[in-house]
Amino acid sequence: MRAVYDDIKKTRNVPDVNSFWKYLARDPVTLKRTWESVKEVMARGALDPLTKEMVYVAVSVTNGCAYCIASHTAAARKAGMTDAMFGELMAVVGMANETNRLANGYRVPIDEFLAT
């Protein structure tokens, strides 16, 4: 567990691990597996860190995870997200949720040209 905590602190450049990881430590196997997965997925790749954090915020809002919203909004702000970017992100999340529900409610069939 200590090695995982040390890796989290080093990777995230923070003095201590946040509550999420402390709660996961109740099951060291889950802690290690989850950290390794998060570390791999959130590493720099085709998407830059800010984009990944903003996607995480959007999914967290949709899933209603207050802890994840707070954590990843802070990380996105640290990576450069401005108030204007956050506002647009919330507008997109809200619109996507609304139009998704309408499409599902009306049972709109997928257009042939979209089914690729």
Regions from the PLM with identified roles:
Residues 1-116:
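Hydrophobic alpha-helical segments
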